[in-house]
Amino acid sequence: GDDSNDTATINAKLMDNAGVLSSLMAELYKAGANVLSVNQSVPIHSVADVSVTVRIAEMAITKKELLNSIEKIDGVNSVVLS
């Protein structure tokens, strides 16, 4: 069936600093999002594009709350949730 409500894709631009991706992953873990895949581009001008697909069916918070928590991470330049 249509399970588009079960998964979400997070597209973020991350500074190429140690710990930024793990901070992002920690937020997803805290939210109860189940990470299905992670794709990270080679950094250009110290910024890497990251795409994370997550299962959100069991998530404890809303997508908007998740977006807000990711935006607050030091080293996250931009984030879009689709």
List each language-model region with its residue ranges.
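A conserved regulatory-domain signal marking ACT and ACT-like small-molecule sensing domains
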Residues: 1-82
